[in-house]
């Protein structure tokens, strides 16, 4: 019987056996082959571990980003990811299953390499072991924040995920333990990441785990453990600062310039000084219709490829415009916030001047309106007009425009719907193409890496996040001066002259959260950031979602269900998450 290291996982990492079969399955390697010549085998083994991350990163993004408030979808969808958007949690969701399966495959492969190789043989072997510890710790962290409740809510009582570090010696008599607690899962995460930090001495670029990647992830992990602004955990906040210091002070990474930030998605990771760790993708992995089904394919249509059915939310666009209007029109292009460059409205051709605004259609639904603009002889917008048809009769209705900020072409308009007469502000702009009834504000932050396509290497850690981690942790410790310096480092890069003059207990939470939203949008962070700080997710903006719904951090739906197939296949008890608020443990 030949023991082999396989790239398969069914509910738990299994070391399979093959009797009388000399040819090993694809992605497998004989254990004796590895131990006899580890350096010759390591590349193939490590490639297998990283390959799991590529498949895992797709549902990882959708679980984290779609449950937030940075995007909207054109309409209801039968795709399983719509449950992430709607918070209609079910345990039978194939995308959630993929997130679980491919993550645990990565954990299994990393664990088996750790078990098979001894430390101290060479710097290269130690570094590879460190990469395995990093990947395992990182995956457990991404799991515990998705399936386990926020750390500030009774972490010793609430359940995290099963700790399955490799294959049992006796695979014929398996009895796996139930899910570890949230606290125990975090302990595993920290143990793995610290071991990774210790072992890794070779930096092979952002496509591979490194000492800096381990320190960056530890900074985030401790931030997640640092409590809320109202009740900070002063044991863990200093550790978030400590590990952020290690990354920032290492000199191994640098923030890109404002001009480069506007082109950030197009920079290949190995040429990007801000990138710490990414799940590296290459062009040969994206061919033909693959561009439709990658993450970027839902956000935009580029070169005729991509569904382009998810758009930047009005809430996110308002945040971008908060310090000044971002103008995407070709003839007057101006980005007040550099991060607005990741949004690309689809203007119709030839251009048609309109005023665009949002009104309540009824008591529960908001929607966009785009009306043609009429200018006077001096070129000043004076009214908007709309053609309404009742039966066979067409009537033109005109609406006076009042300047709110003429320089930025912001005007107020009084408009009537069945909800009543409403006076709102709108932008003079060109008409944006509609998908159903929603303007197509394409998102390109997950596309165009090195080419005009949807090629994208999902970001796990980059330097800007580390500055914001340190800002938040220092604010929770009452060190507002230090927090302000870091906050303004990121804000001032994106918005010329946009730095804050002060930061204190009255505004730190709002300002730091805002900057994390702006800077880390479309990196699968937003929903977790809201809930870990005890916030409430609100989506009071146009879209087919429930616009009146509010999801507080105490809700049972802030975490995902354990996939039912995983429960069914698990060799032991695998407890499901609560199915209503009565089962939620908060303290």
What does each of the following model-derived ranges do?
Residues 128, 135, 142, 217, ...:
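"A position-specific structural signal for the A-helix of alpha-solenoid helical repeats
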Residues 81-148, 176-184, 193-204, 453-458, ...:
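Conserved, well-structured interaction surfaces
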Residues 121, 144-151, 204, 221-233, ...:
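Short coil/turn linking the two alpha-helices of tandem helical-hairpin repeats
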Residues 18-19, 188, 273-275, 280-310, ...:
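Long, intrinsically disordered, low-complexity segments
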Residues 20-21, 194, 200, 212-261, ...:
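Aromatic-residue-lined binding/catalytic grooves and analogous aromatic/hydrophobic interfacial grooves
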Residues 327-461:
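Flexible, polar/acidic helix-loop-strand segments at domain edges
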Residues 4, 19-64, 347, 385-386, ...:
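Membrane-proximal, proline-rich intrinsically disordered regions
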């Amino acid at each position: 019987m030949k023991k082999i290291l396989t790239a398969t996982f069914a509910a738990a990492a299994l070391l399979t056996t093959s009797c009388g079969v000399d040819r090993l399955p694809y992605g497998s390697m004989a254990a004796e082959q590895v131990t006899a010549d580890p350096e010759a085998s390591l590349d193939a083994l490590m490639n297998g571990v990283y390959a799991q991350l590529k498949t895992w990163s797709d549902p990882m993004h959708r679980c984290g980003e779609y449950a937030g408030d940075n995007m909207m979808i054109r309409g209801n969808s039968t795709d399983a990811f719509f449950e992430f958007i709607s918070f209609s949690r079910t345990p039978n969701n194939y995308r959630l299953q993929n997130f679980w399966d491919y993550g645990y495959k990565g954990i299994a492969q990393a664990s088996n390499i750790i078990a098979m190789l001894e430390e101290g043989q060479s710097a290269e072997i130690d570094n590879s072991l460190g990469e395995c510890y990093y990947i395992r710790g990182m995956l457990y962290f991404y799991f515990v924040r998705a399936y386990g409740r926020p750390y500030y809510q009774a972490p010793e009582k609430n359940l995290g995920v099963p700790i399955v570090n490799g294959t049992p010696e006796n695979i014929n008599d398996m009895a796996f333990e139930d899910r570890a607690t949230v606290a125990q899962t975090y302990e595993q995460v920290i143990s793995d990441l610290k071991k990774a930090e210790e072992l890794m001495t070779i930096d092979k670029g952002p496509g591979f785990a490194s000492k800096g990647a381990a320190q960056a992830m530890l900074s985030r992990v401790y931030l997640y453990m640092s409590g809320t602004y109202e009740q900070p955990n002063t044991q863990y906040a200093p550790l978030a600062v400590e590990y952020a210091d290690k990354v920032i002070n290492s000199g191994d990474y640098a923030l890109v310039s404002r001009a480069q930030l506007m082109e950030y998605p197009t920079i290949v990771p190995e040429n990007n000084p801000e990138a710490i760790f990414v799940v590296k993708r290459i062009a040969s992995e994206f061919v033909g219709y693959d561009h439709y089904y990658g993450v970027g394919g839902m956000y935009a249509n580029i070169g005729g490829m991509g569904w382009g059915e998810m758009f930047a939310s009005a809430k996110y666009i308002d945040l971008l415009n908060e310090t000044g209007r971002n103008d995407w029109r070709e003839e007057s292009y101006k980005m007040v916030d550099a991060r607005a460059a990741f949004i690309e409205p689809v203007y119709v051709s030839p251009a048609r001047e309109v005023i665009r605004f949002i009104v309540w259609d009824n008591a529960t639904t908001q929607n966009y309106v785009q009306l043609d603009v009429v200018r006077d002889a001096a070129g000043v917008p004076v009214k908007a007009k709309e053609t309404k048809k009742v039966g066979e009769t067409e009537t033109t209705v005109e609406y006076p425009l009042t300047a709110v900020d003429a320089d930025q072409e912001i005007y107020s308009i009084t408009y009537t719907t069945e909800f009543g007469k409403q006076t709102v502000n709108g932008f003079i702009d060109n008409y944006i193409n509609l998908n159903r009834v929603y303007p197509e504000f394409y998102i390109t932050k997950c596309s165009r890496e090195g080419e005009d396509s949807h090629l994208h290497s999902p970001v796990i850690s980059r330097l800007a996040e580390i500055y914001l981690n340190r800002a938040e942790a220092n604010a929770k410790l009452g060190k507002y001066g230090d927090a302000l310096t870091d906050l303004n480092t990121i804000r001032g890069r994106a918005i010329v002259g946009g730095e804050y003059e002060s930061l204190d207990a009255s505004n730190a939470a709002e300002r730091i959260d805002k900057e994390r939203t702006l800077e880390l949008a479309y990196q699968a962070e937003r929903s977790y950031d809201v809930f870990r700080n005890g916030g409430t997710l609100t989506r009071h903006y146009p879209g087919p979602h429930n616009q009146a719904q509010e999801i507080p951090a105490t809700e049972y739906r802030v975490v995902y269900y354990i996939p039912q197939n995983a429960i069914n296949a698990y060799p032991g008890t695998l407890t499901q998450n609560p199915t209503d608020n009565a089962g939620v443990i908060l303290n």
